[in-house]
């Protein structure tokens, strides 16, 4: 202790002419996959970078890395594993197909229900069976932008509010310059593995479930968790939101938005105290993490989507390193990501489980925080991807 201290069926449908279309424009690229530009439409199926097994194709026409020009809180980030990407389409990528994804009905203005805050279980909208597991103080529904920087970097992505989930006290995130470090009673605690269905082990040394669908159900389809998990010694202060749902008719994917921050930076950056966020999907097409960076790392302290760094570190920001975007939050002097958007493909009519989990790694101090918002069923399927929102 530091002194701080997943119906397995396959559906085949043939159409004459026939993938989902959205209101945003999308142009087929050389691999035949429709790819909307990043930031155009936040419905499922936006472009980005996914993780897979062997030689691969990119899922974006823009190979740049977030922050590579040094303009956002400390410049580019070095990742800890080799870049591996892929692009997989399903029925949602067949031109002319009509999408049946339900509309979004925000309803978070009248209460602090965490499911309403992320865009679920609203009247007339998507309904799920949800659980909230962890210390009560690990969950906080926030209204409006987080922090004081202008233009606001962290406004709600749908409705008026978003969910803050923490490995400590989530509401601490609203206190400027606070050193957020609370050891709470986690849903799981004491250096153990995350609860089922999450499995930290990779499905294969060489393949993901995208390259070998027979691996579904044998571990983490993305192969993104184990390497970083093995750097530490188990989960502490674990908190999660999880839901089960039947995928709506003629719906082939979903998306949600997230951002992650950690007090572990800078002192424990690139060490075994690699606090993590995992977005785990349990489905017919995928069992594993769906939120990861372009280099194959989960969303963690040591991952390459760490856009805002408000202190120097000897690895990738040895000089002046500032992130005014974090002003007015507990992460002043620490680090976080931009809003990110994760998308993943699913099968219409199947039952899925989705888990949003955050936890400390190796000990229970120095908090890590995740924002969650804007869950939407969408038109396009394919492999999981995460992009800057």
State the predicted function of each range.
Residues 1-18:
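Sec-dependent bacterial lipoprotein signal peptides
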